[in-house]
């Protein structure tokens, strides 16, 4: 194995030199600061070259997490850097339909894990505004150790709206100057008015509060659907045309269909590397290959952002790239939803990506409730890991992540050295996906990625899943052997297949699993001073 790895390293380094795909790296940065650029094809797992930017779709690779300087390895689709390398699924609770707006569901009511409005059962349908998610079985505690189911029951279906809480009356958000330090993770169940939610139906608007806080202090605003979104869907591509306030832009994504007869569920693969597309297609889902750099370009200053999003909302927009990239996927879903539905199912869409595109996949799934399955891979700082944990873990610093690319919104710059002042943390961002499917994949061998902090975020978010009766719908898996960044891993093949079958094909019911490596296991008890309530 060591000899094979040495030979692979030598070959990839040679390819790196020949193709001029290498860029200067940063020892604190798993993606590499030289990610964007011009010219230079990069090596991908499938062997395809990418001549747009020095890194493959802007992503840089890591070699086995080793530290030091000198040539690192171009691994599975990312361009190499000179510099150091630095869940299964949830169960379908039988009889999980809700009763009307704000009504509590009971196990045994009609429907099959679905959500409904006005008391009408709906297998896999969208949630009513104010409607609660059903509980089909009791939830169990998700521990910080390896393995184990994280709960049971709950809906698995995506919502029919991008933001189901858009009509919620959110109170006054705090000013940054009024924020005080809190070393513990904020209570996800505590509303802006200081009271805690007591029912599942209240989560809809509590979620909206968290969303508004995240947009104000962390990511920048993700605007709602523009005035006009049109486009086409074919067997090979989806095109998107957007018009808003007298401005217009367009972009497209390619489609690769699995065998069989459509329409098919689909997984949006952000950035083009790190995702196990073979397993995804073999499970029966199409691949939508999304180039986020067409929507928000890397390598631009914060006061002159470029791409389809910024053409509409202005180059000086304070919205960061992660939210802008999410806006692009939401517009793709708009077009699919408006199409004939003969190619792609609009209500069975997932999203995945690795490294910087793992950060993107995470937020894409968070901010669009029409996405049924969110699968971030090795997302690192600005992704899943709790911000409060990053300084103590030795992960890429928040100031480094903020300065590397305008991923965060501009406002986050005030918190890079004081994350304890933030009124939210990523366990609440994780919780925003609930009760939909979430499968977080991580790498315990690269401390730079913050895997301990990511594990804590998953455990904290899982508390909300359990409170909503959807504990089976979240998984976290970092128990893997290969430390290569963004590698396609055999340990994830089975849970990936089961996740797709459950959340996209609606044909599975496997319980969620928290399976953390002993190399990077976090402990939620060290980070919280609140307890999970029993919601009505």
What does each model-found stretch correspond to?
Residues 378-429, 450-458, 464-471:
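Mobile cap/lid helix-loop segments that gate and shape the active-site cleft of serine hydrolases
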Residues 16-163:
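Ser/Thr-rich, Pro/Gly/Ala-heavy low-complexity intrinsically disordered linkers and tails
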Residues 269-340, 346, 380-389:
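Cap/lid segment of the alpha/beta-hydrolase catalytic domain
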Residues 324, 351-354, 376, 409-411, ...:
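Extended catalytic-interface subdomain
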Residues 161-252, 257-262, 434-536:
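Alpha/beta-hydrolase-fold serine-hydrolase catalytic core, especially in secreted/extracellular enzymes
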Residues 1-20:
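Sec-dependent bacterial lipoprotein signal peptides
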Residues 331-394, 403, 408, 418-419:
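Primarily recognizes the serine-hydrolase "nucleophile elbow" in alpha/beta-hydrolase
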């Amino acid at each position: 194995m060591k000899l094979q790895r040495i030979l692979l390293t030598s070959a990839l380094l040679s390819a790196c030199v020949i193709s001029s795909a290498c860029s200067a790296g940063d020892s604190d940065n798993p993606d590499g600061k030289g990610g964007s650029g011009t010219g230079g094809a990069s090596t991908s797992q499938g062997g395809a070259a990418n001549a747009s930017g020095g890194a493959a779709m802007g992503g840089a690779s890591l070699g086995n997490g080793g530290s030091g300087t000198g040539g690192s390895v171009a691994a599975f689709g990312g361009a190499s850097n000179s510099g150091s390398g630095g869940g299964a699924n949830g169960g379908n609770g039988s009889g999980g339909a809700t009763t009307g707006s704000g009504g509590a569901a009971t196990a045994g009511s009609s429907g099959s894990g679905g959500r409904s409005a006005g008391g009408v059962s709906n297998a896999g349908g969208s949630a009513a505004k104010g409607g609660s998610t059903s509980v089909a079985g009791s939830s169990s505690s998700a521990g910080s150790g390896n393995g184990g189911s994280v709960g049971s029951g709950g809906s698995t279906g995506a919502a029919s709206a991008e933001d189901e809480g858009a009509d919620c009356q959110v109170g006054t958000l705090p000013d940054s100057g009024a924020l005080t330090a809190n070393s513990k993770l904020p209570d996800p169940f505590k509303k802006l008015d200081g009271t805690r939610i007591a029912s599942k139906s209240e989560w809809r608007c509590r979620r909206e509060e968290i969303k508004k806080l995240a947009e104000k202090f962390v990511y920048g605003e993700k605007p709602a659907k523009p005035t006009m979104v049109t486009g086409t869907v074919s067997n090979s591509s989806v095109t998107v045309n957007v018009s808003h306030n007298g401005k217009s832009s367009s972009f497209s994504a390619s489609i690769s269909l699995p065998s069989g007869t459509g329409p098919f569920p689909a997984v949006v693969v952000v950035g083009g590397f790190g995702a196990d597309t073979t397993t995804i297609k073999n499970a029966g889902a199409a691949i939508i290959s999304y180039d986020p750099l067409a929507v928000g370009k890397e390598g631009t200053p914060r006061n002159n952002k470029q791409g389809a999003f910024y053409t509409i909302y202005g180059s000086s927009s304070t919205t960061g790239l992660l939210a802008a990239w999410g806006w692009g996927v939401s517009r793709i879903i708009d077009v699919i939803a408006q199409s004939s539905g003969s190619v792609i199912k609009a209500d069975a869409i997932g999203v995945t990506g690795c490294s910087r595109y793992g950060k993107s996949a995470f937020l894409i799934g968070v901010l669009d409730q029409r996405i049924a399955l969110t699968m971030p891979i090795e997302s690192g700082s600005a992704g899943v890991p709790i911000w409060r944990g990053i300084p103590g873990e030795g992960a890429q610093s928040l100031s480094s992540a903020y300065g590397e690319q305008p991923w965060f919104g501009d406002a986050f710059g005030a918190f890079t050295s004081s994350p304890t002042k933030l009124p939210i943390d990523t366990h609440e961002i994780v919780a925003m996906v609930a009760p939909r499917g979430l499968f977080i994949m991580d790498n315990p061998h690269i401390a730079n990625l913050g895997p301990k902090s990511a594990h804590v975020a998953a455990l904290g978010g899982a508390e909300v899943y359990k409170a909503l009766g959807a504990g089976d719908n979240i998984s976290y898996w970092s128990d893997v052997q290969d430390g290569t960044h963004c590698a396609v891993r055999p340990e994830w093949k089975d849970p990936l297949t089961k996740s797709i079958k459950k959340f996209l094909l609606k044909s599975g019911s496997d319980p969620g699993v928290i399976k953390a490596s002993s190399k990077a296991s976090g402990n939620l008890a060290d980070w919280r001073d609140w307890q999970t309530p029993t919601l009505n």
